[in-house]
Every structure is written in structure tokens, then in C-alpha cells.
Curated annotation (Swiss-Prot):
This is Putative multidrug resistance protein MdtD. The keyword Isomerase does not apply. Residues 1-11, 70-76, 125-137, 186-196, 246-262, 307-341, 417-430 are periplasmic. It is found in: Cell inner membrane. Its main location: membrane. It comes from Salmonella dublin (strain CT_02021853).
């Protein structure tokens, strides 16, 4: 990094700020959801759509981001991503209804989907390969700080200003970032193959319609017959994509990926695993505020140990997998996360609040070990010709499963709560207790998939793939 010219350093700073904006926004909103519900006159049971709309949009748009950057240029797309993200933030702050807020979050998600993958591509183009790892470490560090600051910052802004400021703070940062991108970043383009628009549309329709069908009865009052039609339509779109990919060599994601057994198992396990774990960052601050009566600031502070545990575990997870193997680590962390989530609920309902930071620290550590192991398992055996496509598909599945997880969590709250939730009441405690029991079962189920994973303990497998991903 010391030998890089000044203009390259500035370009890395621009990418780093983009990573920070995107990662901050994934966690800062969760703490503010109860306050948003009160301000908008909505039930807290409907507020999960604020999270789902953003994460699902990111999942849908991810496959197109790399192609757009190659075709139109990394500067143009990164500039557009920051502008869209900033405009989305402004519209979020100006929203007067839940529907307006959800639409604004969709616009924000379009920008967020392009920001991180295009940022990675930019680093690859402006930095020599010998310094690529150091450069990626530099630009991704703010992305790790964002989730740490997000809950606490969101709590401070909600408690001492209003929820609108969690979006307004993005505007000055976005303006500076857009100007710096336009002036300092080179606009690299390369020859691209034809974009698989039919495949992209089939996947986008399938993901969006299936998620809507999962949640429509509670949030939108859609009739059961309409929901059944939506579910059938979404499933048909996914099946049509599989048929399309089988016949088309230039498909968005080649079916040759699934000839690698560890990729198939890892992708299926990642999808199922992140549905369960994706519920926790959404449900925890909601429960702390609505179930236990914590202030937004206090609830935000309580989330910090979980992020610290996650960051700390990344330093030793490679050695753990090398020692015990993928199967043992994945099964143990999956079951362990389910048990820790039940421990959190038990400690909270017993009133032992002083133990909550320790439990959340443990939850972050277990979750991080599982995430890192799942990612490595999924990609480690792919041939180089398919590695980029496999990584893109994994990124899309990660976002999709998180949106499904939040949707299911909201559905469970609605089912047990029946629209009647009050602050720190006995009935509310029962609602969250039943919801957490269901969540624990959902979190534990992927252990069945991971039990089929080969228990590979070769030392170079994890470490070499970890380096390659950076």
C-alpha cells in the first residue's frame, strides 16, 4: 500500500466509503423500526417490510451489477450507485407512509446492490495483483465498522432526534462520495458478452413473487387463492430459469456449478442457514424495545457485543475448521446457534439483563464461525472458470435467504401476536417466546444438510480459498 500513487489511494478511499455506507445501512435501520412504526401509525408487525424490501432488491440486482460495470464503466456505475443510494435515503426520510418508505428502500437497494461488487471490481482494476490483498483489507475495514456503529448510532439518532436522521446522514456523505467518484475514479470498461436478460428477469420475478407470496396474507391482506397463484407463478419462473440455463451456454448462472458436490451442499446449506440466522439481527432489537421496554439507544448498545463477537471469531475460524473439519464445525455451530438463541430468550425473560451482552457476544461468535465455514465450503472446490459465477450466485442467495428470514420472522410475530402487542407486557412476552421457539427450530434444521458434508480437515483447503476470496 505504501507504493501506490496518491490518486489510487484516493480511489481506494472512495470505495471504502461506499462499503461503509452500504454496511451501515444494513444495521442502522433495525434499531429504529419500533419508532418508525409509531411515527407512521403502523403496527410493529408490519415493519419487517422495511428490511425485506431493501435486502430483496439487493438480491435481485446483484447479478446485473458486474456486467453493467464492465459494459458502462466502473466509474459511471459506482457514481450511479452512490446517487441512487443517496436519493433513496432522501426519499426514505421524506416518507409519510409505510408504502412510501418501502418504495424508497427499493431505490436504496438498487444503489446498494451495485456499490459493493462494483467496488471490488474497481480495486481489482486499479491495484497491482501483488497488493490486491492489502488493498481489499483496507477497503473492507469500514464495511466491518459499519455494522458495529449502526445499531448504536441508530439508537442515538432515534432517541435524541428522530428516525428520519438515520437516512439523512447518508446525504452529505453520498454527495461527497459522488463528486469524488466523478472527479477521481477512472472509467474502466472491457468487452462483455451478451447479458442474459431472460434469465435475469426469470430469477428476479421468481424471487420477488415467492417472497411476496410468503408474506402477503399478513402484510397486504391478499386472499389465499391469490397467494397460491403467486407461489405457483414464482415457482414456475424458477423452473423456467433452470430450463433456460440448461439450453443456454451464456446463462446468468451455469448449471455446471452444481456438478461440484461441495458447492451444491454449501449453497443449499447457506440458503437454509441464513434464513434462520437472518431473523436474529431483525428480531433482537425489536424484542429488546417492544418486549423488554429498552430505549432505542440501550437496544442499539446491546447489539454491539454480537458484532464484536463476529469480528473476533474471524481471526480463529480457519484454525478451527482445519482442526475439526467442515462437517463437525457446521453441525456444531448450527445447533449451537439454535441453543444460544434460546438462551438469549430465557435470560431476557428471567430478567437477568446483565448476562445479555455475554449471550449476544457468544451468539456473534457462533454465527460468524458458521458463516465463514459455509462460504468457504461452497466455493473451495469450484474450478477457476466457474469461481466468479459461483461467488455471484452465493452472494445473491445470501441476500435472498436473509430477506426470507426476516419475512418469516414478521409472519411468526403476526401469527402469534394477532396484531396485539404492547410494551413489556406478559402477553407480549408470550408472543416473543413462541416466536423464538419457532426460530430456534428453523435455525437448527440446516444441521441435517451439513451432516452430509465431507469432514475435510486438509490444512491448505481453507487458507488458500480464504486468500483467494480477498
Amino acid at each position: 500500500m505504501t507504493e501506490l500513487p496518491d490518486n489510487t489511494r484516493w480511489q481506494l478511499w472512495i470505495v471504502a466509503f461506499g462499503f461503509f455506507m452500504q454496511s451501515l445501512d444494513t444495521t442502522i435501520v433495525n434499531t429504529a423500526l419500533p419508532s418508525m412504526a409509531k411515527s407512521l401509525g403502523e403496527s410493529p408487525l408490519h415493519m419487517h417490510m422495511v428490511v425485506v424490501s431493501y435486502v430483496l432488491t439487493v438480491a435481485v440486482m446483484l447479478p446485473a451489477s458486474g456486467w453493467l460495470a464492465d459494459k458502462i464503466g466502473v466509474r459511471n456505475i459506482f457514481f450511479a450507485a452512490i446517487v441512487l443510494f443517496t436519493l433513496g435515503s432522501l426519499f426514505c426520510a421524506l416518507s409519510g407512509t409505510l408504502n412510501q418508505l418501502v418504495l424508497a428502500r427499493v431505490l436504496q437497494g438498487v444503489g446498494g446492490a451495485m456499490m459493493v461488487p462494483v467496488g471490488r471490481l474497481t480495486v481489482m482494476k486499479i491495484v497491482p495483483r501483488t497488493q490486491y490483498m492489502a488493498a481489499m483489507t483496507f477497503v473492507t475495514l469500514p464495511g466491518q465498522i459499519g455494522p458495529l456503529l449502526g445499531p448504536a448510532l441508530g439508537g442515538v439518532l432515534v432517541e435524541y432526534a428522530s428516525w428520519h436522521w438515520i437516512f439523512l446522514i447518508n446525504i452529505p456523505v453520498g454527495i461527497v462520495g459522488a463528486m469524488a467518484t466523478f472527479m477521481l475514479m477512472p472509467n474502466y470498461t472491457i468487452e462483455t458478452r451478451r447479458f442474459d436478460l431472460p434469465g435475469f428477469l426469470l430469477l428476479a420475478i421468481g424471487m420477488a413473487v415467492l417472497t411476496l407470496a410468503l408474506d402477503g396474507s399478513k402484510s397486504m391482506g391478499i386472499s389465499p387463492w391469490t397467494l397460491a397463484g403467486l407461489a405457483a407463478g414464482g415457482a414456475a419462473a424458477i423452473l423456467l430459469y433452470l430450463f433456460h440455463a440448461k439450453k443456454n451456454s451464456g446463462a446468468l448462472f451455469s448449471l455446471r456449478l452444481f456438478r461440484t458436490p461441495t458447492f451444491s451442499l454449501g449453497l443449499l446449506g447457506s440458503f437454509a442457514g441464513r434464513i434462520g440466522s437472518g431473523m436474529l439481527p431483525f428480531m433482537t432489537p425489536v424484542f429488546l424495545q417492544i418486549g423488554l421496554g429498552f430505549s432505542p439507544f440501550h437496544a442499539g448498545l446491546m447489539m454491539i457485543p454480537m458484532v464484536l463477537g463476529s469480528m473476533g471469531m474471524k481471526r480463529i475460524v480457519v484454525q478451527i475448521v482445519n482442526r475439526f473439519g467442515y462437517r463437525r464445525v457446521l453441525v456444531a455451530t448450527t445447533l449451537g446457534l439454535a441453543l444460544v438463541s434460546l438462551l438469549f430468550m430465557s435470560v431476557a425473560l428471567l430478567g437477568w439483563y446483565y448476562l445479555l451482552p455475554l449471550v449476544l457476544l457468544l451468539q456473534g461468535m457462533v454465527n460468524s464461525a458458521r458463516f465463514s465455514s459455509m462460504n468457504t465450503l461452497t466455493l473451495k472446490d469450484l474450478p477457476d472458470t466457474l469461481a466468479s459465477s459461483g461467488n455471484s450466485l452465493l452472494s445473491m442467495i445470501m441476500q435472498l435467504s436473509m430477506s426470507i428470514g426476516v419475512t418469516i420472522a414478521g409472519m411468526l410475530l403476526g401469527m402469534f401476536g394477532q396484531q396485539h402487542i404492547g410494551i413489556d407486557s406478559s402477553a407480549t412476552h408470550h408472543v416473543f417466546m413462541y416466536t423464538w421457539l419457532c426460530m430456534a427450530v428453523i435455525i437448527a434444521l440446516p444441521a441435517i444438510i451439513f451432516a452430509r458434508v465431507p469432514n475435510d480437515t486438509q490444512q491448505n483447503m481453507v487458507i488458500s480459498r480464504r486468500k483467494r476470496s480477498l
